[in-house]
Design a protein with these regions (language model features):
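Periplasmic peptidoglycan-binding/anchoring modules of Gram-negative envelope and division proteins
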Residues: 13-43, 67-72, 77, 108-112
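Periplasmic OmpA-like peptidoglycan-binding domain that tethers envelope proteins to the cell wall
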Residues: 45-112
Length: 112
């Protein structure tokens, strides 16, 4: 399973890392420091509201916020790629606040 974490929650229309997200990223940074050959892809996702273009840009900002946070813990930027799916890959297909909350996320995936 290449997927490492999901659900790094974000606030609507923002790329804010929650307290729980920061803790998850700290643990990932610690693991990555011990496994220096591993690279990761940070995927940014958005809910269904907004245009495709807007949500792709928002997903990229979310993934970059996670990347910046990992870098503050000493993980080199050349080990981290960023990819935005915008609203194209929801984890919940519902059209309600709970589904939207689940779909606003960053996901860390092991690249190798």
């Amino acid at each position: 399973d290449r997927q490492w974490s999901r659900g790094l929650g974000d606030v609507y229309k923002r790329q804010v890392l929650t307290t729980a997200s920061r803790e998850t990223l700290r643990k990932q940074a610690s693991w990555l420091r011990k496994n220096s050959k591993i690279t990761v892809v940070l995927e940014g996702h958005a809910d269904e509201r907004g245009t495709r273009e807007y949500n792709l840009a928002l997903g990229e900002r979310r993934a970059n916020a996670a990347k910046d946070y990992l870098m503050t813990y000493g993980i080199s930027s050349d080990r981290i790629s960023v990819l935005s799916y915008g609203k194209e890959r929801p984890v919940d297909s519902g059209s309600n606040p709970l589904a939207w909350s689940k779909n606003r996320r960053s996901v860390t995936v092991k690249a190798n």
